[in-house]
Every structure is written in structure tokens, then in C-alpha cells.
């Protein structure tokens, strides 16, 4: 990869402070998001995907969470809450859309009023130019009649339409990086596909980077250039989407791929047995060892370190250590 990373995360750890104890819910994550490319972070529910994304946006309350490591974006550390310059990046150079679009909107204000709130916070535009900008981004996201749309309240729109509006709102400031936290999970299957295609089209048009949070390997196959497999808040595997699908190295990655429905297997899918560990009761060795069909004795005793299989493929597994 010749280009410099737009976002460079180094040894990110997130600790939940509870009952006078500190639990590492995310530990020592390192990954890059490159200009114009999509990095997908995939894992089961409870793997730490959303915690990772929210920590980058400073959305986790300091009274309950503490952080270590760096997340460098335009030479600013996104984890530094005392830096005014860093805070100014959120909503302008970095935007985020969420799993449930309804929670992104205030029910007592029209869509237009909420667009103007974003503009007043981040852009210096006259009311006329702001209005034109709102209509333009709504047209870009597929609205045929944006004038009518902006007069409506959130409850008057479907989930798919609200997610399109959330994307349009994120695009108002022409961000360099869009973080999409499970953006299609709460939507119907046909609408999911439309939203994914919209994101791909907008990315190609604007050149923005995408950090996609998902539990769905189908979304990864459709959207990602690079893939970061996360389990129990720890990196399992990190590589290009081609290597993840064609040469998966970690048993968890293999099991995720096997758990997808397929018309080419006699058994349409193979579920992963057991449940991910709770952050308060993590296994002594590899966090995946209790569920792993290839576990070695050492897997239950010592956590593996990251091993490079090549320049762009890393795995944490004793099978490759």
C-alpha cells in the first residue's frame, strides 16, 4: 500500500471502569484506513466493533471509559479529548451513521430544521445557499422530491428513507471519512442492498474513505477493500478482502465464512457453537479457544501475538505462531 493512511489506529485499548475495576473491552487494536478505500470491521455481537467506532468519535463517556493508544487523523489524535482542533473534526471531516436511523433524529423537529442544525455547527453558509446544499445532497442520495421530504418529521418516513437522509446529512460537510456502524441491519433486505449501493456510488463520486462496522460477511464481500476480524475486543485477523475470503488464516474467520448460508454446500450453513466470552470473564489464553475446533493445548494457556503471514496479512493464532 503506497498511499499514506487517512486514519492510523495504533494500539487502541478501551477500558470499562466498573465497580472500582477496569476491564479491557477492546485491547491493542492497530489498523489503517486508506484514502478512497473501505475497511470493514467484522465480528459477532459483543465483539467490540461499535465500542471501537464510538471511541474514535469520542462518543463514550469519560466517567465510564478510559483509553490508551493513538488514532491519528490529519495528524491529530482522535483520542485526545483536550484538543479543540480534534473536536472540530467530528461532524465535519469525520461523520458517522448508525444502525437505527430513527435514533439519529429528533422527533419534534422537521428534517429541514435538523439539516440546518448541522450546517450552523460546521458550515458558514447563507440560508439560501444552505437550502440549495440540502436539496443537492438529498438528490445525490436518491430523493426525487427533496422539497417535500425536508418538510416532514422523522416519524413520517420509513427506515430506509431515514437512513438515506442520515447519509445525506453526513455528506453535507464533504467528510474525508464516513464511519458506518451497522447501517443496514435494521432495514429490509431489499432496502439494505439499496443503501450499500448508494454508499458505494457516493464513495466513488466523492473519494471519501469508509469504515464499515458489520457482522455480515455478505456486506464485507460487497463493500470492503480491507477486513479487520474482531473477536472479544481483540484482533483475530487483518488483511485484504481477497485474502480473507480465499485464504482465511484464523479459525474464527473460517467459522464466520462457514456460517454464511450457501447454495454450494449440502448444509446451507454451519453455526458457530457456544457464545463469545463476556469482557469480565475472558479466557486465560486465546479468547476463541473454548469454541475453536483446532485449538492446541497452548491456546488455552497463553494469548497469541500478531503474526505477519505477508506484508498485508496478519493473524493472532498459535496455528501460525
Regions inferred by a protein language model and the residue ranges of each:
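Hydrophobic anchor residue at the start of the ABC signature
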Residues: 115, 167, 191, 195
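A short, proline-enriched helix->beta-strand linker immediately N-terminal to the Walker B motif
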Residues: 172-176
